[in-house]
Amino acid sequence: HLDYHHTMEEYRRAKGLLFQQCRKAVLNLDDEAGRWYLDNIPCPAFTYSENKNGADLSARNIRLFPSHVEFEALTLGEISRVHLPIPGGFSIYNALAALAAGLCLGLALEDMARVMPSVHGVKGRVEVVPVPRAYTVLIDYAHSPNALENILSTARDFTAGRLICVFGCGGDRDKTKRP
């Protein structure tokens, strides 16, 4: 959203205003901004992490596949196996954020983990295209250099051989991304 906020500092400040109205925040401890908000917001926080000790919710025994991810979610001594039919390491973070929000609302970890296999991704975001060959085709609307790097990293996680990327610049919202 830098096309609107112009700098990361301005974006962080604007986003921080939202926490003035919250009873509880859900923050990713693996993210620099999440750690910054933890120290700079007025409301209590529920934290999650893929790899930091001390988070309220964490993931372990992570397995990445071309069509899905699997991991164990741990919170307050409770462990639930999660199967999410959306590939990529970032999917683990999205699942942890959703689980953390649900836990804050009083939902049971086991109940949420049970329905995760029925979650479908957003069309055009790490969308697996079925093909009759022994390779994987993904469609992703990677709309920034960082997003393109992330999808290529995701694909590399489960690609043994050659990785081919075809990309274009559709749309015209952010004029700084194309002539």
Please report, for each region that a protein language model flagged, where it lies by residue.
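Active-site flanking residues adjacent to catalytic metal/cofactor-binding acidic residues
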Residues: L27, I139, F167
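Switch II (G3) loop of P-loop NTPases
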Residues: T136-H143
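Conserved cofactor-binding/catalytic machinery of classical short-chain dehydrogenase/reductase
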Residues: A97, H143, A147
